[in-house]
């Protein structure tokens, strides 16, 4: 259970804590809609294909497409995926650093210190790079009842984006809705 993000960085949004558009709380950016996929085959619709009636890579004719879809088929031949995307450029780096500095003031200093100990690649949150931080959050949660997990989750996402921008100059990101 939970929603994922992927692209130049990857991970999972904190369940019940973090929205799919949390990037917008770090920098001034608006999400782009997700990809469109053809019904039937699931291929991604290219922008110049939006006026087509079926995927021409997978079907020889509209009739072949309709045969597979069934005679009851109505509506658009493609669906929008339940995702949003961001193309973050290094123009946002200064604003991101300012946001991270503000977040640090709201987070238990032990957690910030643990995050700052990470000197390796943070692009893949599934690699265990945040394991020490996660364990510390669990310990501190037992001490403090009203710790703002949303701020901690946002800070971790922001650090991933920051490292990606510093390394690549941009950060492309898809977020599951």
Where are these regions (language model features)?
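Acidic (Asp/Glu-rich) sequence patches and key acidic residues
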Residues: 1-167, 175-177
């Amino acid at each position: 259970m939970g929603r994922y993000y992927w692209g130049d960085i990857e991970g999972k949004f904190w369940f019940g804590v973090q929205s799919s558009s949390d990037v917008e709380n770090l920098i001034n950016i608006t999400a782009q809609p997700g990809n469109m996929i053809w019904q039937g085959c699931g291929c991604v619709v290219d922008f110049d294909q939006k006026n087509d009636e079926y995927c021409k890579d997978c079907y020889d004719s509209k009739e072949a497409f309709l045969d597979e879809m069934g005679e009851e088929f109505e509506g658009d031949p493609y669906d929008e995926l339940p995702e949003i995307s961001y193309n973050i450029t290094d123009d946002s780096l200064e604003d991101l650093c300012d946001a991270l500095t503000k977040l640090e003031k709201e987070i238990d200093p032990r957690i910030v210190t643990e995050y700052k100990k990470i000197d390796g690649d943070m692009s893949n949150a599934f690699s265990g790079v945040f394991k020490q931080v996660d364990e510390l959050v669990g310990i501190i949660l037992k001490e403090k009842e009203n710790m703002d997990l949303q701020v901690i989750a946002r800070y971790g996402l922001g650090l991933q984006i920051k490292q990606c921008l510093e390394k690549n100059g941009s950060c492309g990101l898809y977020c599951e809705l």
